């Protein structure tokens, strides 16, 4: 890779990292290409970007985008998105199914370096859409129970008449 190509890669990563709400760094050593494709496809469905990046280039891009403090060693694959929950869910779900080969190392969430435990905790939280669905279900429950009661009363009166 020439110096100009490296500069272009760093500039592209820098602009993407600046808009990213969360960046998760994982160890992928030993994963087959087929399994990496599964990861990329599931990430693409959630609008999460996945890329294997050299640590030196990633360090420069992270530093230039004011996301410092992550210790990057060995082979890493980077997942990032503007949606914190989507990134953590994709990484945690893939780690569950490939725990022997894929490990979450560190993350950058909410302007600070996050531990693996925080990433896993975030991955278990419901998404915005799921929260809205839960709220609507709570709002609809009293009305639904009321209509069920009215229907039961109506049927009871019809049977007695």
Curated annotation (Swiss-Prot):
Family designation: Belongs to the universal ribosomal protein uL10 family.
GO cellular component: a single term: large ribosomal subunit
Name under which the protein is recorded: Large ribosomal subunit protein uL10
GO biological process, one term: translation
Keyword Cell cycle assigned: no
Disulphides: none
Pfam families: Ribosomal_L10
SUPFAM superfamilies xref list: Ribosomal protein L10-like
The species this protein was found in: Campylobacter concisus (strain 13826)
Sorted UniProt keywords: Ribonucleoprotein, Ribosomal protein, RNA-binding, rRNA-binding
């Amino acid at each position: 890779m020439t110096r100009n190509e490296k500069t272009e890669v760093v500039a592209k990563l820098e602009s993407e990292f600046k808009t990213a709400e969360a960046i998760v760094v994982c160890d992928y050593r030993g994963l087959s290409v087929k399994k990496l494709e599964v990861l990329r496809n599931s990430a693409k469905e959630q609008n999460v970007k996945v890329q294997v990046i050299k640590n030196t280039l990633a360090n420069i891009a992270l530093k230039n985008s004011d996301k410092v403090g992550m210790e990057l060693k060995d082979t890493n694959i980077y997942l990032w998105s503007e949606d914190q929950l989507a990134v953590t869910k994709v990484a945690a779900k893939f780690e569950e199914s490939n725990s022997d080969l894929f490990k979450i190392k560190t993350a950058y969430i909410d302007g600070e370096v996050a531990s693996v435990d925080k990433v896993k905790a975030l991955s278990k939280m419901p998404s915005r859409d799921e929260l809205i669905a839960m709220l609507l279900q709570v709002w609809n429950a009293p009305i639904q129970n009321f209509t069920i009661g009215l229907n039961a009363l109506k049927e009871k009166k019809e049977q007695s008449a």
